Amino acid sequence: SELMQYSVNYNTEVTSQMNYNYSITESVDASIWLGLYPQAGNAEYMLHQAEKEDNPAMKGVALILKTLVMSNIVDAYGNVPYFDALKIALQKDTLNYTTRYDDMKLIYADMFAQLEDANAAFVKAEELKNSGEIPQTDFSALCDYMYDGNVEKWRRFGNSLYLRLLM
């Protein structure tokens, strides 16, 4: 069986009226694409910075956020640019916007691997914290509005996301 892409719109006056009349414009579909890819690029940049600073906790968070955003894109569109697409976020020359579309089965396999890597990064962060070597293994509410720097809560969220992707 094939996976089915879906899109749900909340009830707003103008948009709902257009949908009820089957007057769906290109902008309705494009808003998901244009809204989420920059967020995935931000997560990729965060991942790059975490690796550069050897910050395993931040690396785990970045992997989870990247997977969360990309899973929403894949669920909405199916095959999408994935493996090469986010490299653009790290390039100084952003004129190259052409990339291949990757198979969603391969993307899902990679997202599972990313979430497993996130768990491994959190284990490393805890080991560093427990050993007394704390080279930025924690982060605070200043940069973590979701869980106030609580690695265990991020691990639970990542595991919940893993289960959602399995469905």
Model-predicted regions and their roles:
Residues 1-6:
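A short, exposed helix-loop element centered on a Lys and neighboring polar residues
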Residues 9-65, 71-167:
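Structured, solvent-exposed acidic/aromatic patches
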